[in-house]
């Protein structure tokens, strides 16, 4: 957790340099515990994503972990603000995480957001239509609220946290 301009926030992230930033059972438990604390204190959750997705070595434990994250997100929906920033890969089951948040930001050049890789779609190739890039996700899918460089995204998130109420019972914002 931390503070942005006096506002308590809870932040989680994936480090792509460690196991590709993949999510397994223990990483998911940290995220779900963070959601529990955020709900208890009525503070926003910010996710910073650069991940290969599911940790395949953990098989069904990792799949269950994704389900636990989704459940916490749905319980938090409408109660606390949820913000996601995608700075690298956000694929497979992890692609649902930004879809379940209130605000989604994407880095404009290297971020990719997809359930299935664009080449997995019949008749599509990345050279024809990259359905995973920020422009497509913003303009066509309507999932992304802001595209920019990492520093711009972090600045926009700080501004957003200062404008939003901390939770559904906050009358001070």
Residues of each region from the PLM?
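Conserved catalytic cores of soluble enzyme domains
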Residues: 49-169
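Long, structured ligand/cofactor-binding scaffold of large enzymes
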Residues: 1-77, 82-83
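Active-site loops and adjacent core secondary-structure elements that bind or stabilize anionic groups
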Residues: 173
């Amino acid at each position: 957790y931390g503070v942005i301009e006096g506002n308590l926030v809870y932040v989680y992230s994936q480090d792509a340099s460690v196991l590709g930033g993949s999510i397994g059972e223990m990483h998911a438990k940290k995220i779900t515990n963070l959601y529990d604390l955020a709900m208890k204190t009525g503070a926003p959750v910010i996710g910073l994503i650069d991940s290969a997705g599911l940790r395949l070595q953990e098989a069904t434990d990792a799949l269950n972990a994704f389900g636990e994250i989704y459940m916490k997100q749905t319980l938090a929906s409408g109660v606390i603000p949820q913000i996601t920033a995608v700075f690298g890969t956000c694929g497979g089951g992890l692609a649902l995480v930004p879809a379940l948040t209130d605000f989604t930001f994407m880095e404009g050049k290297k971020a990719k957001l997809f359930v299935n890789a664009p080449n997995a779609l019949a008749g599509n190739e990345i050279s024809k239509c990259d359905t995973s890039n920020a422009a497509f996700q913003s303009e066509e899918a309507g999932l992304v609220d802001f595209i920019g460089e990492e520093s711009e995204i972090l600045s926009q998130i700080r501004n957003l946290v200062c404008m939003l109420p901390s939770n559904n019972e906050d009358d001070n914002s």
